């Protein structure tokens, strides 16, 4: 039997989308492991041992990340996703905001070796998972650019400058988070009228 989830929102805080939409996409569903780094974003632990993320914290962090990323030249934002379910959402995020996407295997030296054929010089890195995208994160740290990361309950965040707490493994969760973040970046730039995409446009196809 699946445990039904109810999450309350403090006071009159208004989320970017209804809480039910976050829950339907499974954004709140964490793992059965937690790190001390992610404790502050955990809402509760279910009877089956699964940690549940606080979607209000997720919502606030999407707002913060949108404001942060909107300060950068679009072409200087690099979004990376080794994880399959994050590849289409990451690519669509890049298309929507004018960023650059690097999906699939991240080739070492992409950010650190000017003599490498695929060398690029971003000013900020956005990753689907700081563990799965660890090579990109390491190189970002080496060259001194900030890292924004979608982080699940089991992630370490020591090399992450801005955490977005979310289920970073589920197809629907990654679709919704990248869609929301793209919309928020354009909103912060005053360009929301350019955002013509639906959530399904961001979803991985089979």
From Swiss-Prot:
NCBIfam families membership: uS2_euk_arch
CC annotations in GO: small ribosomal subunit
Keywords carried by this UniProt record: Ribonucleoprotein, Ribosomal protein
Similarity comment: Belongs to the universal ribosomal protein uS2 family.
Pfam (any one): Ribosomal_S2
Gene3D superfamilies: Glucose-6-phosphate isomerase like protein, domain 1
An example Gene Ontology biological process: translation
PANTHER family in the record: 40S RIBOSOMAL PROTEIN SA (PTHR11489)
Keyword ATP-binding annotated: no
MF (Gene Ontology): structural constituent of ribosome
Protein name: Small ribosomal subunit protein uS2
